């Protein structure tokens, strides 16, 4: 005779969505939205909206004062700079704490984000607003956006065991700056940026729950400073 499952377990089984952590819910929601958006992009259902935004922000494909003023931010916030920032912050945290786990966390976040972004770009193979397919494989999702969201958010995950809500405002603030520069310059479609943001947020939500993050903050395992070897 089998024992009946506790009431709490039965409730979680019946309502799996409610049994998940907020981070898991956020990751799942972003993944579902990304799948829907990808299908819409592939079927060109978003093309009219994308073209309307492009025509409004860069009419007649002209290069004017707005483009001159905003376009430098694309270079300042490009993926290489973002990944270098995350690497520098993680290396500093590793040296300060005497453990390589912060660096491992950064490598995981950077590697997975870059790999997934490139894979999705190659799968969708979308042209940019000027009709070209970039060397990275395509315009969707925006690699600039993925790198910015993951790396700025990753710095917070590396530095703080518990990130206060107002610190997260740094990510959308920088994201708004990058988005404006990408769209005004005509470097990306609007849905490219949205796709990059969804992928980046999903990866951050997952990364916040990884065991390697707990280890990076000395929770769940010894550090070198405590006399144990790192990874």
Predicted segments, located by residue:
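Hydrophobic alpha-helical transmembrane segments of integral membrane proteins
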Residues: 104-133
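Membrane-embedded catalytic cores of phosphoryl/pyrophosphoryl-handling enzymes
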Residues: 131-231
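Alpha-helical transmembrane segments of polytopic integral membrane proteins
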Residues: 50, 113-117, 152
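Aromatic-anchored segments of alpha-helical transmembrane domains
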Residues: 35-38, 111-119, 173-186
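Structural signal for the C-terminal ends of transmembrane alpha-helices
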Residues: 2-18, 91-100, 155-162, 206-212
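Interfacial segments of alpha-helical transmembrane regions
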Residues: 20-31, 86-113
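N-terminal transmembrane-helix/juxtamembrane module of multi-pass inner/ER membrane proteins
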Residues: 1-82, 121-132
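Hydrophobic, membrane-inserted alpha-helices
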Residues: 12-13, 67, 84-92, 150-154, ...
């Amino acid at each position: 005779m089998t024992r009946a499952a506790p009431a709490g377990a039965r409730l979680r089984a019946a309502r799996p969505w409610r049994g998940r952590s907020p981070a898991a819910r956020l990751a799942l929601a972003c993944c579902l939205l990304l799948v829907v958006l990808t299908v819409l992009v592939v079927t060109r259902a978003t093309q009219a909206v994308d073209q309307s935004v492009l025509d409004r922000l860069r009419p007649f494909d002209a290069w004017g004062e707005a483009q001159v003023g905003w376009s430098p931010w694309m270079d300042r916030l490009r993926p290489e700079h973002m990944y270098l920032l995350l690497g520098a912050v993680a290396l500093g945290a590793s040296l300060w704490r005497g453990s390589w786990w912060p660096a491992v966390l950064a490598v995981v976040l950077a590697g997975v984000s870059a790999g997934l972004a490139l894979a999705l770009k190659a799968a969708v193979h979308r042209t940019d607003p000027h009709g070209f397919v970039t060397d990275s494989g395509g315009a969707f999702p925006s690699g600039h956006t993925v790198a910015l969201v993951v790396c700025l958010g990753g710095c917070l995950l590396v530095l703080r065991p518990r990130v206060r809500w107002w610190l997260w405002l740094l990510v959308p603030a920088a994201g708004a700056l990058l988005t404006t520069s990408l769209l005004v310059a005509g470097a990306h479609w609007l849905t490219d940026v949205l796709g990059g943001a969804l992928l980046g947020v999903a990866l951050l939500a997952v990364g916040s729950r990884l065991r390697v993050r707990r280890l990076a903050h000395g929770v769940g395992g010894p550090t070198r400073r405590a006399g144990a070897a790192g990874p």
